[in-house]
């Protein structure tokens, strides 16, 4: 088993939720020796500005990189050229207005607030959708010549993204730029929109104790995924210890 060089973690319900647990995660992270502390990536459905504001409110360690908007945005404070390169890698032609025209004709769908939208992410609410309902949405988009990716999680949140974007694809791209192998990386999460990170080949994962069944099912399929008994940030600490990361 290779040493860990990178952690990519979801925020809400994973390292954010219980401030005491978040503080314990921060202290655990800061206690790691400088030569063993992995690159820290926050990988959330929140947009970048929202994540930066959150960092002012909760006791998290400072990340090295931020992936936002379910894999549609990258913030790299020390390597800003990566931000432009990643956006360019997603291609052109994604049109939220055209997507909205299609979605507004679908029963049961409502658009999320403006603060959850941006030029490469169209976000909606659709409660308790099954595979057939999601398939109908995908077919309606294709009929309108919209080739996009649908990410559905928490039996409610529906994100429509460029075909090349999701949390996993963004992480794989970043690891490639940093020359860090996926087998040297670990991911942590709690819902279905984190699933794309776990589906990357050779990556290891931590599924926190409060995770939804849509993600917990992965723990029963592959021993690369550790299902913590502890919840939220305490569960991430438990998982990192399982994968051999400990303060000296």
Swiss-Prot record:
Kindly indicate where the leader peptide sits in this chain: none
Organism encoding this protein: Agrobacterium fabrum (strain C58 / ATCC 33970)
Catalysed reactions, as listed in the record: beta-D-fructofuranosyl alpha-D-mannopyranoside 6(F)-phosphate + H2O = beta-D-fructofuranosyl alpha-D-mannopyranoside + phosphate
Q: Does the keyword Repeat apply?
A: no
- List the SUPFAM superfamilies hit by this protein, alphabetically: HAD-like (SSF56784)
| Keyword Hydrolase included in the entry's annotation | yes
Which pathway or pathways does this protein act in? Carbohydrate metabolism; mannosylfructose biosynthesis; beta-D-fructofuranosyl alpha-D-mannopyranoside from D-fructose 6-phosphate and GDP-alpha-D-mannose: step 2/2
Per UniProt, activity regulation is: Inhibited by the phosphatase inhibitors fluoride, molybdate and orthovanadate.
Task: From the Swiss-Prot or TrEMBL record, give the protein name.
Answer: Mannosylfructose-phosphate phosphatase
What is the gene called? mfppA
Name a biological process GO annotation.
disaccharide biosynthetic process
Which family does the UniProt entry place this protein in?
Belongs to the sucrose phosphatase family.
Example GO molecular function: phosphatase activity
Judged by the first EC level, this protein's enzyme class is hydrolase
């Amino acid at each position: 088993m290779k040493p860990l060089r990178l952690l990519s973690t979801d925020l809400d319900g994973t390292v954010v939720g219980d401030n005491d647990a978040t503080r314990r995660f921060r202290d655990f992270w800061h206690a790691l020796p400088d030569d063993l502390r992995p690159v820290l990536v926050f990988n959330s459905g929140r947009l970048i500005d929202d994540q930066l504001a959150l960092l002012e409110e909760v006791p998290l360690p400072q990340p090295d990189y931020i992936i936002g908007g379910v894999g549609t945005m990258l913030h790299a404070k020390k390597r800003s050229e990566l931000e432009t390169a990643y956006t360019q890698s997603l291609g052109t032609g994604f049109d939220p207005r055209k997507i909205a025209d299609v979605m507004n004709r679908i029963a049961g769908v409502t658009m999320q607030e403006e603060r959850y939208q941006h030029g490469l992410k169209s976000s909606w609410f659709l409660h308790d959708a099954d595979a057939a309902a999601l398939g109908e949405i995908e077919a309606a988009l294709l009929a309108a010549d919209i080739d996009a990716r649908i990410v559905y999680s928490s039996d409610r949140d529906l994100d429509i993204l460029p075909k090349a974007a999701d949390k996993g694809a963004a992480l794989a791209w970043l690891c490639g730029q940093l020359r860090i192998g996926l087998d040297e990386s670990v991911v942590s999460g709690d819902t279905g929109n984190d699933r794309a990170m776990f589906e990357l080949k050779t990556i290891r994962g931590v599924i926190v104790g409060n995770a939804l069944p849509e993600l917990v099912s992965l723990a029963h399929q592959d021993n690369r995924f550790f299902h913590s008994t502890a919840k939220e940030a305490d569960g991430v600490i438990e998982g990192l210890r399982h994968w051999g990361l400990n303060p000296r």
